[in-house]
From Swiss-Prot:
Homology family: Belongs to the Thz kinase family.
GO biological process: thiamine biosynthetic process; thiamine diphosphate biosynthetic process
The organism's taxonomic lineage, starting at the top: Bacteria, Bacillati, Bacillota, Bacilli, Lactobacillales
Organism of this sequence: Streptococcus pneumoniae serotype 4 (strain ATCC BAA-334 / TIGR4)
Residues holding substrate: 39, 187
Binding-site residues for ATP, renumbered to this chain: 115, 160
Chain's gene name: thiM1
Name under which the protein is recorded: Hydroxyethylthiazole kinase 1
Catalytic activity, reaction form: 5-(2-hydroxyethyl)-4-methylthiazole + ATP = 4-methyl-5-(2-phosphooxyethyl)-thiazole + ADP + H(+)
EC number: 2.7.1.50
Function: Catalyzes the phosphorylation of the hydroxyl group of 4-methyl-5-beta-hydroxyethylthiazole (THZ).
Length: 260
């Protein structure tokens, strides 16, 4: 069974502790894809939810001291119940405090994957690239950044940009799909982190397969959305992207995938 069919069959509960800007978009994107999102940030909820979860997303976009403690508590409980956790270290290259939080979560808690743009992942491994807040300029050595992070942390890495790189156990795969409209809609990268959290726990020991499917499904849905009427307009693209996530099939992935 393919990873996409498995996701739709299992409808994994994904606990999304994410930033305030993208919660609605993230929840709707996961529902469209076939997962079951829970956006609770109430500490007393964590154990009750995580014991049944198929994935956990920690996105540090709207960072506070209280949220840092929430991330730590969630990751501790996720490890107790063997729930795969994905970290999205938003803008960790933009300031020392964010870098400190990201380093803490990576070094002291169990993570199943890290997803970030080239600037964010590069900052985690000390590679200097052009970065501006949550955005990252076009980077030529995205594969090297992914491999460096995978080697340093021994965690599967997804680095996104004009081309995406996935590094698992020293192997790197490049995904050339995607839409130029994605950066024009706030939250597309953050939703990808949640999609990764939805796929990563579906098949034990098949992290590379799961991550490839997650990124391909996501990026090809973006291509489909852009080609629809008025898909070149951000508002229409946002709606059509959710529609495409709902409608995308394994046949679409097989036909349109561009992987190296």
């Amino acid at each position: 069974m393919t990873s996409l069919k498995l996701l739709k069959e299992k409808a994994p509960l994904v606990i999304c502790i994410t930033n305030d800007v993208v919660k609605n978009f993230t929840a709707n994107g996961l529902v469209a894809l076939g997962a079951s999102p829970a956006m609770s940030e109430f500490p007393a909820d964590l154990e009750d939810l995580l014991k049944y979860a198929g994935g956990l997303l920690i996105n540090i976009g709207t960072l506070t001291d209280e949220n840092w403690k929430l991330y730590q508590a969630a990751l501790k409980i996720a490890e107790k119940y063997n729930v795969p956790a994905v970290l999205d270290p938003v803008a960790c290259g933009a300031g020392e405090y964010r870098k400190k939080v990201a380093d803490d979560l990576i070094n002291n808690y169990k993570l199943a994957a890290i997803r970030g743009n080239a600037g964010e992942i590069a900052s985690l491994v000390g590679i200097d690239v052009a970065s501006k807040g949550v955005d990252s300029a076009g980077v030529d050595n995205i594969d090297e950044i992914a491999l460096a992070a995978n080697e340093k942390f021994n965690i599967p890495i997804v680095v996104t940009g004009e081309v995406d790189a996935i590094a698992v156990n020293g192997e790197v795969v490049m995904i050339h799909n995607g839409s130029a409209m994605m950066p024009k809609v706030i939250g597309t990268g953050c939703l990808l982190g949640a999609v990764v959290a939805s796929f990563i726990g579906l098949e034990k020991g098949q992290e590379l397969k799961s991550l490839k499917t997650a990124v391909l499904v996501y990026n090809i849905a973006g291509e489909i959305a852009e080609k629809r009427p008025n898909g070149h307009l951000p508002g229409t693209f946002k709606v059509e992207f959710i529609n495409a996530l709902y409608e995308i099939t394994d046949e679409d992935v097989k036909e349109f995938k561009r992987v190296k």
